[in-house]
Amino acid sequence: PRLADAQFDTADDDDDSLEQRIIRFAELSCQKWNGLRQNSNVVSRTALLKALLIAADVAGSALTADGQRPAEWIPRELSARITPELLMPIISKGTKGKEPLPFQRAVGASDKPTTIVIAGCGNGKTTAAYLWAQRHATGRKLWFTYPTTGTASAGYQGYLYDHPDLLSTLMHGRSEVDLQAMQGTAEDDRDDEPLRLESLRAWGKQAIVCTVDTVLGLLQNQRRPLFSFPAIAAGAFVFDEIHSYDARLFGSLLRFLQMFPGVRVLLMSASIPPSRMKVLRELLGDRAGDEIRGDEQMEGHQRYQFEPRDSAESCRMDVTAALAAGMKVLWVCNTVGDAIQTARDAKQWSGVASERIIVYHSRFRYRDRVKRQKQVIAEFEYYTDGEKKGQRVKPGPSLVISTQVCEMSLDISADLMLTAECPLPALVQRLGRLNRYATDDDPWPCLVYPFQGDPYNEKAEWVQTRGDYRASMGAARAAVRELAGQPCSQRDLAERLDGMVDTEQFETFSAWLDDGWLTEASQLRGGDTGITLIREDDLDEIERELGPESSKPSKWTSRLLVPWTIPMLYRRGFQPMRQAGGYPVAARGSVAYSVEEGATWRTNTN
């Protein structure tokens, strides 16, 4: 739309002010876009132009301020691409110097633009992904995406962190804290580095390990991927654990695949529900071949045995017996409140010292959660070579009581598992933490007790606001009931997943594509009434640790405050006392906290 040249007053209260003219221009632009959006070519080209203009602005302003010449810096950085030779040490490390497994070779040999891999634990999916990248990421930048910050950091540390020649980086909102933990030192330079400068680093990397938000956030106009767009446009992509995406995030994945049909993509998971596989097949057509399944022999090992129980309390005798025998026990609850209460009760009846009982969930300060995750992994660690191969590094009993966070962030193998009822895909993921390294038929017990309620709504009247888990919860109960008392394998569970009837609906709105010229960001993941906050109780500690240069609240940035952030369920009536670095500050005493149990609202249950 066009407006004629005119003189006007800049006073905001004038009917013909600059503000009013901007409003009218925006209204006319929206009207024009409503007509243009019917043309798919206009939609895609507008989105590309929007991303390129934003990225160019970021590069131009940041590089000029830094004394760089954009015309020289940009092509030099974007020319950093993967070569097959760079990935050889990573693959050799993953295979321990041996030949890749047949499953891994099959993934590496896939010649389709999009490859779908469905394989359980122990198959070496990550190593298979780097074999795939040798073929499909050569001449491109490799984006290896994970669903959470924890899994992204673990993936980076386990495979790329110490690679001497590969230009790589870890990108997510909390990556600096995790990188400091890997280095074992704190960062001395506390000057704030704007998000745009952080995003520019990806332009010059050959491999980027990140949360899926760093890539798919592009579909919702989120800043980090918009600033990184030239590097994304040069990418090949691995999307791991796609079963964990909620309906909105999975919808953005669908729009990404639709928008970029020529991009090389690897989709991986231990399980993909039929409803998701169906829509992927319809979208991809011949761009994807048959899904590649895990090793047939490995997935056929009888490694689990369901033991239904009437209640959580009826599991206690099994737990005390296992702990008395020096076993490692993993107990998975569906809510943080249940996990904390279960741990408190276990200190009274378990028969082990309280320090052998560890609570692990999402509601810790981020720095404490990182430490807690390392502690849990250390409790279950095995020697991988030498005379002690196959023995626990830390012998003796342990009881880890966790929530859904264990489904992806913990590469551990428990001797006994207990779990509340949960959707079948989640149950399959939880079982990946039990008898993980089985090499033959040797079923270990998984005790399952009843559960109803949030976060797995099964009431029809609440489907619109709380989701619909009726089919997946019913499928899980049927699997436990019908397989109870008999050995079962990953293949048995995969067959039940394939037969699960699910009517899941995906949200495919994209602010980047559908909103045309607008750049307002939209939510990438489904809302869970969550809020990430800082406690007023921690402000004194923050001032001390940040030091004199950054101790003033006016200098606090979101990046500096990440170690003290806590994700909480939103409590009705919550009013932050103020903001710090963009985070709401909860009034002193309103959020109880301990490094052993994490955070809870003082007046409400979680």
Listing of model-derived features with the role each one plays in the protein:
Residues 111-132:
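Walker A/P-loop
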Residues 1-86, 586:
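N-terminal accessory nucleic-acid engagement/regulatory domains that precede
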Residues 341-348, 352-379, 384, 388, ...:
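C-terminal helicase lobe and adjacent C-terminal extensions/tails of nucleic-acid helicase motors
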Residues 141-152, 322-347, 358-361:
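Conserved strand-helix element at the start of the C-terminal RecA-like helicase core
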Residues 226-239, 243-295:
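Post-DEXD/H (motif II) to motif III coupling segment of the RecA-like Helicase ATP-binding lobe
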Residues 164-221:
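Inter-Walker segment of RecA-like/P-loop motor cores
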Residues 273-323:
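Interdomain hinge/linker at the junction between the two RecA-like core domains of SF2 helicases
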Residues 140-162, 172-176, 272-277, 336:
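Conserved Walker A/P-loop ATP-binding site and its immediately adjacent core
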